[in-house]
Every structure is written in C-alpha cells, then in structure tokens.
C-alpha cells in the first residue's frame, strides 16, 4: 500500500492540474460564446467536441483584453444592442467574429435562464453546421439605419399629432376632410376664424400643437435631405433606385439592413430574408402555403410594398408586358396581393443588380 500524501503535496498537484487545464482551455477554444450586457460580460468557451472548457465573467473594461489573450477560433455574440460595435472591434483585431439571432439561441438554453446558461447556449448554437448568422454592420450602415429610424419615428409622431388635433376639434363639433393635404389647408382657417365656437384657451392650445407640427415637418425635411445626399453619393443605392417603384428610402434601407449582398447565394434568399415569401406548413406529401412570413426588417418590407403600390397606380393605361401582368393580377387577386407580388418580384431584381453591378433595364 502506498504511503499517504502530505497535504502540501496534494495542494501542489491540485494547482498543477488547474494550471494545465487552464493552459489547455486557452489553446483549444474553438468557439467563444459571449453574453454581452452593459457592464458585465459572460464568456463560455467550447472545444471541437462541444465540451465547455472555459467560463469567465468579466467587466466591460476587461472584455477586449481578456478575449485578445485567448486563442479562440471564433467569437460569437447575439445580434443585440452593442453587438455591431464589438463585432467591428474584434474583426479589426483579426479575431473571427459572428453574430447570431437571439431566436436561434433560445432553443439551446437549458434549465434556468441566466448569463452563464445564455453564453453556453450561444456557443452551442454557433457550433451547428446549419446555423444561420447575422451580417455585422459597418459604421456607415449604422449611420444610415439611425437616420432612417429617426425619420420613421418623426413621421409616426407627426401622424399621431395630426390625429390628436382632429380628435380635439371633433369634440367642438368641427370635422376636417380626410388626408394630410386638406388638414394643412383647413387648420389655419379654423384657427383664424372667430365663428367656429372655440374658446380662446383652446385656440392657444391648438396653435401650440400646430407650431409643434410645423417643427416636426421641418425636422423630417432636414433628415430627408440628409438621406437624399447619402443615396446620391452611393453607387449601389443609385443602381437600386433605377428599378421602377423603388425610391431613395428603399434603396438606403437595402444598403443599411442587407449589408453584403454576396451572403445570399440566390435571389430567392433575399426575398425570404425580407419576409416576402409564403410561410410553409407542410407535412407528408401535402404542401400548405400560407401568407407571407413577415420575417426580417419591417421597414424595408414596408417600403418595398408601398413603392409597389405607388407604381400600380400608374399601370392602368400602359400596355407593356409587365403592366399587363400587373393589371391581370389586380383583377384576379386584388390590389393588396398585387402590391406584395410586385415587391417580391423587385427583391430578386435588387439582388441581380447588386451582384452584377448593373443598372435596371426595362424589358419590352
């Protein structure tokens, strides 16, 4: 029987085993899943067999230096707030980095939800060969996306303000014609009239709201001028704008949300990315197609459909092949479905123009 080891020898062997395990962890990390937050980041590294070999919780100030000290095959984070900044940071350092959609991570979260389990789920999801990743954005793309979102918020708040003024006037028995154009024509007349039954206090309130509305219009105009200048200076936006029914807002939304067009190997993939293809609920030999999936960027899909709707208003007297197809589609399926069909037709055209670096050529 071997003599018992002394406590000092046992502690020394334990420290050696921990050191060897730590060295192995730093060398063999294939995927480093990171659950990012504002101040604290949870790291989870797995090897080529999917086994967890490294876990650590670090502060924001230590995050970059900690990842840089590890020899990792790939850093993976959820595509959430701040992810694009870290994506650009690590890619600039030469560290392969991927972003993954949170909806693809959720099925891999085991037991309770916490930062440790989330980081492990991110690493495990990223290890799947069929996993789909999110394209990281450049600084320019984020600038354009910010401008588009701010403009969209201002437009929605302007609509809400117009409806608020209409509702207030209706309580005093005053109704206005439908449409923003008629609203801007009639409101100054109402405020200037003495025979409409409004109290002086209410007139002051409505004048303040009207001033706020005009300021909102001015802000929207400033952002639109900025967006037009960006679209004019971007060659890809000019190519996309050459398509009938596609304006500068749609072209910029494509630039900001799609990113590298070469991530899509077929034109159909871009339509699916935008959410313009039917949802499928099939089983066995029975194929069931439902309405459009509505996945992806809501703003881009909305702009494509609204652009298609604007184009359909002018096909009535046209006799070219595309216009005849659209008129037949409107008669058979209605205006709304025709708008979606045209938007779904424009998405592959956008893919073709950007991949081939060409301008739209109208067919006979």
Curated annotation (Swiss-Prot):
<keyword id="KW-0233">DNA recombination</keyword>
<comment type="similarity">
    <text>Belongs to the transposase IS1111A/IS1328/IS1533 family.</text>
</comment>
<keyword id="KW-0238">DNA-binding</keyword>
<comment type="function">
    <text>Required for the transposition of the insertion element.</text>
</comment>
<protein>
    <recommendedName>
        <fullName>Transposase for insertion sequence element IS1111A</fullName>
    </recommendedName>
</protein>
<dbReference type="InterPro" id="IPR002525">
    <property type="entry name" value="Transp_IS110-like_N"/>
</dbReference>
<dbReference type="Pfam" id="PF02371">
    <property type="entry name" value="Transposase_20"/>
</dbReference>
<dbReference type="GO" id="GO:0003677">
    <property type="term" value="F:DNA binding"/>
</dbReference>
<keyword id="KW-0814">Transposable element</keyword>
<dbReference type="Pfam" id="PF01548">
    <property type="entry name" value="DEDD_Tnp_IS110"/>
</dbReference>
<dbReference type="InterPro" id="IPR003346">
    <property type="entry name" value="Transposase_20"/>
</dbReference>
<dbReference type="GO" id="GO:0004803">
    <property type="term" value="F:transposase activity"/>
</dbReference>
<keyword id="KW-0815">Transposition</keyword>
<dbReference type="InterPro" id="IPR047650">
    <property type="entry name" value="Transpos_IS110"/>
</dbReference>
<dbReference type="GO" id="GO:0006313">
    <property type="term" value="P:DNA transposition"/>
</dbReference>
